[in-house]
Every structure is written in structure tokens, then in C-alpha cells.
Amino acid sequence: MAQPGKPQSVLELSRLLNIPLDDCVVPCNFCKRFLSYTELTDFDTKCLSLIWKDDFVFACCRYCCVATAAFEFENYFVESVIGWEIEQKENTPLSDIIVRCHHCLKLLNQIEKLDICGRSELFHKVRRGWKGLCRQCKQI
């Protein structure tokens, strides 16, 4: 949940603080370990939002993203649909449907969503959002 006036990405945070991105020190909201430079850039690449608690900022490390995705999938799974059925289910064009990776939480781009449809793979409804596999996690 975005907080007005607070940076939502690591890049925005580094610009606000007027420091290089690799000087940003942000702890994980779950394990409290500081994210590495690679994890900070991955966090922004996944289009995740920083978590603000009062004036303290947190992110989510790679391991906790995977653990969170697995926990949510196991505990809040609603249903699965095959490929293009997602448009009928949502009554919305695929390009307007927000889908995150059910393994790493990355926001899927249009090509990744089309790939799932073209291969007749599954989209999964978890809580109120849709999940699919991103191209990186398909390789695992």
C-alpha cells in the first residue's frame, strides 16, 4: 500500500536521498537482513513497492519473496484458468490484467502473459490477484 510522498522504489529512494543506488541500505521486512545491490535492483525490476513503517523503509529480499509467494499460494489459492480464459473470467483484455509470478512475485509483462496463453498454461487466482510464471522462473 503506497504512502503519499514516500518513495515506492529503491531508485526513487536513492534519488530522494541523493545517494548512489549501491549505497542504499534497506532491510528485508521479513528476515531483517539487508538486501544486496542485486536484490535491490531485482526488487525494482519486479515492480514491488517499498514498505514504510513510520519513517523506516523496508523491502523484501529474494528468499523472502519466494517464501511469501509460496505461503500465499498454499494458503490463499482460489482457482486456476487455462491461458486465454483469464480474459473471460475478468471480462478484461489481457493487457489490462495485472499478473505476478507465483514463484518470485515479479510483475509479468505482456510478452510473458501472452506466452502463458500461447502455451495453454495456467494462471492462478491467489487472494484477489492473478499469478503465472515469469520467463526466469520457467527456467528453474
Swiss-Prot record:
Q: Name the Gene3D superfamilies for this protein.
A: E6 early regulatory protein
GO MF term (any one)? zinc ion binding
UniProt cross-references to Pfam families, sorted A to Z: E6
This protein's record includes keyword Chloroplast: no
Q: Which GO terms describe its cellular component?
A: host cell cytoplasm; host cell nucleus
What family is it from?
A: Belongs to the papillomaviridae E6 protein family.
Protein's name according to its UniProt entry: Protein E6
Query: Which organism is this entry from?
Result: Human papillomavirus 24
